[in-house]
Amino acid sequence: MTTGKFIVLEGIEGAGKTTARDSIVRALHAHGIHDIVFTREPGGTPLAEKLRQLIKHETEEPVTDKAELLMLYAARIQLVENVIKPALAQGKWVIGDRHDMSSQAYQGGGRQLDQHLLHTLKQTILGEFEPDLTLYLDIDPVLGLSRAKGRGALDRIEQQNLDFFHRTRQRYQELVRHNPKAVTIDASQTMSKVAEDVESAIETWLTTR
């Protein structure tokens, strides 16, 4: 049986990951790929969803930056081992709303946690496991947060100050520049143009991989 592929969408709040996901699905369907699993981080398993609530929402005590990071990795490995890897082994394609690059950008850039700590956690928890393709939706935080606010109340992460998101975006851009399996999409464009660019990126990847 042919192993499936793992495609991940990354970007700050308001970048349009839902629109991009729909575009990926259309492109895959056009190539006869219909057995698709959708995941999100943090979340995707019963335990990971409980951790998501702790990470995304205010609790009776402040969540320290390192505690947040460790909860994210706990949720991630549950999802990878219990959902993503089994799906790929069955030949299914997985489209993920966030993966490890989010922690590298949000916790490494936004929270300014030690890069060595992040690298050690990634190597220890995930080893060589990584997406086959990452689409990074790049958008200015001012525009992205404006879009996010239009969706309703912001969660604990979304309520961080603007500097946090500028640092997160900068770290994303650095990570993508050094990742040959990552493609940047200009998410400041209209949703229809973003969708077009995502489909084009998937088409190019499918025909050249």
Swiss-Prot record:
Binding of ATP, residues: 11-18
Any one annotated GO CC term: cytosol
Gene3D superfamilies assigned to the protein according to its UniProt record, in alphabetical order: P-loop containing nucleotide triphosphate hydrolases
Catalytic reaction equation(s): dTMP + ATP = dTDP + ADP
Domain of life assignment: Bacteria
E.C. no: 2.7.4.9
Any coiled-coil regions, as ranges: none
Similarity section: Belongs to the thymidylate kinase family.
NCBIfam families: DTMP_kinase
Descriptive protein name: Thymidylate kinase
Source organism (scientific name): Pasteurella multocida (strain Pm70)
Organism phylogeny: Bacteria, Pseudomonadati, Pseudomonadota, Gammaproteobacteria, Pasteurellales
This protein's encoding gene: tmk
